[in-house]
Amino acid sequence: MRQLAFAFCLMAAPLAAEIEAARDMMEEGRFEEAYEALWPAARSGNADAEELIGVMYAMGLGVPRDDQRAFEWYLRSAMKGHPGAQSGVGWYYEVGRGLPAPDLVRAYMWYTLSAIGGDPDAAISLEEVVKKMTAEEIDKAHILVEDYKVWMYPFR
């Protein structure tokens, strides 16, 4: 069992280094290279890489801006508990960009999950979305938060 854990750690370290290298490329404006570096990790389900691919599609960094693809990449990462991606999904639901219409109930849910996960900006977004909601919508959102929180953050 220890050997398996050790092997996993050895495999995870290079992946983390690749993602950090891709972040550096993004900061340097080398977006196409960053996309190529992130793509394998994102395709294999790494939440950090998925979130960064979402950012790239949302902002048109190295790829054509595509709100639907951005939302899908954010959602993949968010479902794995990535707080930044959860805020991204919340924002898309709040404004409705790339979606049929805004959905404040789901925006509230995702911002709340993001805040639970540790995103410091999520609380600010949550305050803003609450101003647009009815009491009934907030009640519905609380139900969704409880449903998702149980399996996404079982120890919080």
Go through each PLM region and give its residues:
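Short helix-capping/linker turns of helical repeat alpha-solenoids
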Residues: R30, R43-A47, M59-L61, D66, ...
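Terminal, low-structured helical/coil segments at or just beyond the last alpha-helical repeat
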Residues: D121-R156
